[in-house]
C-alpha cells in the first residue's frame, strides 16, 4: 500500500491511518498512479523507465533499515529493530507481545515503539537510553506520554550483551554511561564498567539509528553518496549528480521529522516541473536561510503576555488503545 513511513512507521495512535488514506485518495483524484510491490532496480530499472518515457525521478525511500544490534546475542530470537516491529504492527502481521519488553533508544521512535509495545500486551515495558533524562532526544510530551502509559525510563545506560537461553532472549545487560558527547559535541559515549545493570525480558526492541537500504535502486547511475549512506544533492533543488534524478526526505538529510520530508517533497516537485520544462532550477527558489533569534539578548516588553503554553487533554476511554487519545483544546484554553 502507498504511504511509506506515515503508514508503516508511525503508530496509529500518533497518526490515524484514515487521515493518510484520505490524502492518498486526493492524489489519486489528481491523476497520480501508484504502483505498489515494485522494486526499482530489480523489477524495473531507471534506465528502463527512461525508455518508457519518464523524464525525471524523485527518490524518497526514507530510512527503512534498523540495522543490527552489534552486541553479543544481538541475533537471538526476540531481538528486533524497532522500525521492523512498527512495520509488522502497522501491517497487522504482529499484534501481540508476551512477557517483559525492553526498548533501547531515547528518541521519538523509541517512545513510539515503547508505547506500541504496551498496546500489544507486554507484561511491562522498560526504556533504556544513553542520555541523561533531561537530555533525551525525545520531547517533553513524549516523556510524559511514556510515563502515562506506565513505561519505566532508565536514563544513562548503554547495552553490552543480550542474555540468551536456548537461542531466545532472556534478558539484557547494561553499563553506566557517564558521557554521550565529547568536548567538540560529537557522539563519543564514555562508560563506567564498574556500574552495571541487568533487565529480565523476552523481547528487546532497539531504536538506535536507521539507515537507507538502497539495494539496486541507483545501480548504474552517477549518483554520489555520503559516508552515512545518504545521497549527495543540491541543498536547494535536490538535484543529484545524475541530472534527471532528484532526492529528498531522510534519504538525503538523514533522520528528521515527517514534516521535513513533506516540505522537501514540495520543493522537489518544483524542481521536477522545471526540469521537464527545461527551465532554470535555481531562480526564485527559497534558499531556507534563517537567522536564529538570540533569545538571551531579546528585549521583552514589561507588558508582554506571559500566559504559559496550553497542554492538550486526553480521552481516558481511549487510553492504551491504538486510537488517538489526544483531544483538542477546550474553549477556555483557547480564550487564554
Residue ranges and their predicted role:
Residues 1, 107-109, 251-252:
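Residue-level detector of alpha-helix initiation sites
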Residues 148-150, 158-168, 180, 274-336:
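Mid-to-C-terminal Rossmann-like scaffold of FAD/NAD(P)H-dependent oxidoreductases
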Residues 25-39, 66-120, 225-241:
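Glycine-rich dinucleotide-binding loop and its adjacent helix/turn
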Residues 248-279:
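A conserved FAD-binding loop/helix module that cradles the flavin
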Residues 77-98, 162, 182-255, 300:
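FAD-site-proximal beta/loop scaffold in flavoenzymes
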Residues 2-29, 34, 89, 114-161, ...:
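Rossmann-like dinucleotide-binding cores of NAD(P)H-dependent redox enzymes
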Residues 7-8, 38-40, 44, 97-98, ...:
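Ferredoxin-like iron-sulfur electron-transfer modules
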Residues 21-71, 161-173, 178-181, 201-205, ...:
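Feature captures the FAD/FMN-dependent oxidoreductase FAD-binding
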Amino acid at each position: 500500500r502507498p504511504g511509506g513511513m506515515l503508514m508503516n512507521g508511525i503508530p496509529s495512535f500518533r497518526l490515524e491511518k484514515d487521515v493518510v488514506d484520505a490524502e492518498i485518495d486526493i492524489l489519486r483524484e489528481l491523476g497520480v498512479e501508484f504502483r505498489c510491490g515494485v522494486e526499482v532496480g530489480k523489477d524495473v530499472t531507471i534506465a528502463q523507465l527512461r525508455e518508457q518515457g519518464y523524464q525525471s525521478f524523485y527518490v524518497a525511500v526514507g530510512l527503512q533499515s534498523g540495522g543490527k544490534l552489534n552486541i553479543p546475542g544481538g541475533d537471538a530470537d526476540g531481538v528486533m529493530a524497532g522500525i521492523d516491529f512498527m512495520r509488522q504492527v502497522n501491517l497487522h502481521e504482529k499484534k501481540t507481545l508476551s512477557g517483559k519488553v525492553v526498548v533501547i533508544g531515547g528518541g521519538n521512535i523509541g517512545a513510539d515503539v515503547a508505547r506500541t509495545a504496551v498496546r500489544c500486551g507486554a507484561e511491562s515495558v522498560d526504556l533504556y537510553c544513553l542520555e541523561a533524562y533531561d537530555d533525551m532526544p525525545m520531547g517533553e510530551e513524549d516523556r510524559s506520554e511514556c510515563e502515562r502509559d506506565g513505561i519505566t525510563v532508565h536514563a544513562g545506560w548503554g547495552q553490552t550483551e543480550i542474555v540468551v537461553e536456548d537461542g531466545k532472549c532472556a534478558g539484557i545487560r547494561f553499563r553506566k554511561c557517564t558521557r554521550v558527547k565529547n568536548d567538540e559535541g560529537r557522539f563519543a559515549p564514555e562508560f563506567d564498567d564498574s556500574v552495571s545493570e541487568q533487565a529480565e525480558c523476552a523481547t528487546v526492541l532497539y531504536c538506535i539509528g536507521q539507515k537507507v537500504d538502497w539495494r539496486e535502486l541507483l545501480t548504474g547511475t552517477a549518483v554520489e553518496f555520503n559516508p552515512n549512506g545518504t545521497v549527495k544533492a543540491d541543498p536547494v533543488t535536490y538535484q543529484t549528480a545524475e541530472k534527471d534524478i532528484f532526492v529528498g526526505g531522510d534519504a538525503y538529510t538523514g533522520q528528521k521529522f515527517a514534516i521535513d520530508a513533506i516540505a522537501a517533497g514540495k520543493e522537489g516537485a518544483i524542481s521536477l516541473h522545471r526540469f521537464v520544462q527545461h527551465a532554470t532550477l535555481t531562480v526564485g527558489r527559497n534558499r531556507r536561510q534563517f537567522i536564529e533569534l538570540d533569545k538571551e539578548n531579546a528585549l521583552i516588553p514589561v507588558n508582554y503576555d506571559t500566559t504559559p503554553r496550553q497542554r492538550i487533554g486526553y480521552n481516558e476511554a481511549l487510553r492504551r488503545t491504538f486510537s488517538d487519545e489526544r483531544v483538542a483544546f477546550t474553549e477556555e484554553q483557547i480564550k487564554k
